[in-house]
Amino acid sequence: MPELPEVETVRRGLQPAMEGATIVRAETRRKDLRFPFQTDFVARLEGQAVTGLGRRAKYLLADLASGDVLLMHLGMSGSFRVIDAAGVTVPGDFHRPRGEDRVHDHVRFTMSSRAEIVFNDPRRFGYMKIVARSALGDEPLLKGLGPEPLGNEFDAAVLAHGCRNRKTSLKAALLDQRVVAGLGNIYVCEALFRARLSPRRLAATLAMKTGAPSERAERLVGAIRDVLNQAIEAGGSSLRDHRQTTGELGYFQHSFQVYDREGDKCRTPACKGAVKRFTQNGRSTFWCPVCQT
């Protein structure tokens, strides 16, 4: 599933085509994706200007002039492509090659610029929903999400507070969207490696007995920010479904230190360990047991 860097890459790719333009036509080619489309989905989109395109965790949020917000989630295999008036895919981020799977083009927006934005989703785990801006705080899909890891509200004290009473592993806590929003398996493995922290470590050890953040929490926040920013700069990670809206792959997978590198030598200077893999809460965890403690 796309994680925060991939979704942010999508947002940046769609932004030039959507922001400031009006949705002239909205077309759904089936009655549902993961969930059924609202009965007034098309009517609430057509004729509306997109005043802003944001992101919350792994969700895209398009603000409409009507006061509604179009909430979009990529699911497992969802992707967007932007096509200009001449039928040429224009720069942006996150789509599959044109012509390969148009049968899976499920949603199409025609913009006032005559550009078209197409949502393709072979596995149909993605979804779209229109929510009134005034009700966004109570939206079940967003309610309860933790702080954005790249936002000003996220720091060592916030992370330590979110983990202080948890009896789960550190990795499990970081994957809990209530603790911090937008992280997934790839970037949690990478951040823990960079912070030299074991994924098996008890999450509560990020806080000292006084409740203040430990030095581990400081290291981990820095590592999370670094790995996410580097991944966004690289256009995300392309393992299975992720491509940029030009059809290009993201390149951060070439910078993985541990993820999907089982058996490789640890990349920490002077460390003689090797990357190991084990199953943790149903997911593969990659780490170096020598330098991650």
Curated annotation (Swiss-Prot):
It comes from the Bacteria. InterPro entries: DNA_glyclase/AP_lyase_DNA-bd (IPR015886), DNA_glyclase_Znf_dom_DNA_BS (IPR015887), Formamido-pyr_DNA_Glyclase (IPR020629), FPG_cat (IPR012319), MutM-like_N-ter (IPR035937), Ribosomal_uS13-like_H2TH (IPR010979), Znf_DNA_glyclase/AP_lyase (IPR000214). Signal peptide: none annotated. GO terms for biological process: base-excision repair. Coiled coil: none annotated. A zinc finger (FPG-type) spans 257-293. Keywords: DNA damage, DNA repair, DNA-binding, Glycosidase, Hydrolase, Lyase, Metal-binding, Multifunctional enzyme, Zinc, Zinc-finger. DNA binds at H104, R123, R166. Binds 1 zinc ion per subunit. It catalyses: Hydrolysis of DNA containing ring-opened 7-methylguanine residues, releasing 2,6-diamino-4-hydroxy-5-(N-methyl)formamidopyrimidine; 2'-deoxyribonucleotide-(2'-deoxyribose 5'-phosphate)-2'-deoxyribonucleotide-DNA = a 3'-end 2'-deoxyribonucleotide-(2,3-dehydro-2,3-deoxyribose 5'-phosphate)-DNA + a 5'-end 5'-phospho-2'-deoxyribonucleoside-DNA + H(+). Pfam families: Fapy_DNA_glyco, H2TH. The active site is at P2 (schiff-base intermediate with dna), E3 (proton donor), K58 (proton donor), R283 (proton donor). GO terms for molecular function: 8-oxo-7,8-dihydroguanine DNA N-glycosylase activity; class I DNA-(apurinic or apyrimidinic site) endonuclease activity; damaged DNA binding; zinc ion binding. Its EC number is 3.2.2.23, 4.2.99.18. Its cofactor is Zn(2+). Monomer. Involved in base excision repair of DNA damaged by oxidation or by mutagenic agents. Acts as a DNA glycosylase that recognizes and removes damaged bases. Has a preference for oxidized purines, such as 7,8-dihydro-8-oxoguanine (8-oxoG). Has AP (apurinic/apyrimidinic) lyase activity and introduces nicks in the DNA strand. Cleaves the DNA backbone by beta-delta elimination to generate a single-strand break at the site of the removed base with both 3'- and 5'-phosphates. NCBIfam families: fpg, PRK01103.1. Belongs to the FPG family. This is Formamidopyrimidine-DNA glycosylase. The lineage of its organism: Bacteria, Pseudomonadati, Pseudomonadota, Alphaproteobacteria, Hyphomicrobiales.
